Amino acid sequence: MKTAVIQFPGSNCDADALHAARLLLDDGAQFVWHTETALPEGTELVFLPGGFSYGDHLRSGAIAARSPIMNAVKAHAEAGGYVLGVCNGFQVLTEAGLLPGALSRNKELHFMCKPVHLRVENNATDFSRAYGPGQIIEIPIAHGEGNYYADAATIAELEEGGRVVFRYADNPNGSLNDIAGIVNERGNVLGMMPHPERAVELLLGSEDGKGVFESLKTVKK
């Protein structure tokens, strides 16, 4: 699956994202700088990595969501192309309107960096088919603003539509309904705060993140 990893000023998980993509999806995966106005021809997956884009000025992801490349990312998503936003990438997706809700300060008001357990809430998406229903997986988090919030109507819509893909088994940040990752209505855009790209090799402590990439690899073109 041809993959483009978007780089914003302040991205710091872009190399991890590229490594995971090259290891599991596309050995020719490449970086795309935020000032570009088009994605590489044939791009199938856009990966928005974690970090502190633009120093988190205004709000996390707010400026990055208005970068030139995001017009192409939106068009890609609207055409049915896959988009994966991790951590700051999830924040960018909400700021860009590609996913509902917002990510606010952690309930403890400090940065958290540790492995957490997630429950696979919906394994029928193109991002989660490699997992079993209800499977508990270990994926690291690293964020200060990962507390997912949306109004009651939006939360109900997410829950009723099976759009909560990953849920915290032991909520670390105060996210409503223990939400760790959601998809859009069409199912081609996933945002999640935990970092699957940091859990693709046993050397890193867990291989449980591989399922996200292995799921995408099974998508029929």
From Swiss-Prot:
Its EC number is 6.3.5.3, 3.5.1.2. Gene3D superfamilies: 3.40.50.880. It catalyses: N(2)-formyl-N(1)-(5-phospho-beta-D-ribosyl)glycinamide + L-glutamine + ATP + H2O = 2-formamido-N(1)-(5-O-phospho-beta-D-ribosyl)acetamidine + L-glutamate + ADP + phosphate + H(+); L-glutamine + H2O = L-glutamate + NH4(+). SUPFAM superfamilies: Class I glutamine amidotransferase-like. InterPro entries: Class_I_gatase-like, PRibForGlyAmidine_synth_PurQ. It is found in: Cytoplasm. GO terms for biological process: 'de novo' IMP biosynthetic process. It comes from the Bacteria. This is Phosphoribosylformylglycinamidine synthase subunit PurQ. It comes from Deinococcus radiodurans (strain ATCC 13939 / DSM 20539 / JCM 16871 / CCUG 27074 / LMG 4051 / NBRC 15346 / NCIMB 9279 / VKM B-1422 / R1).
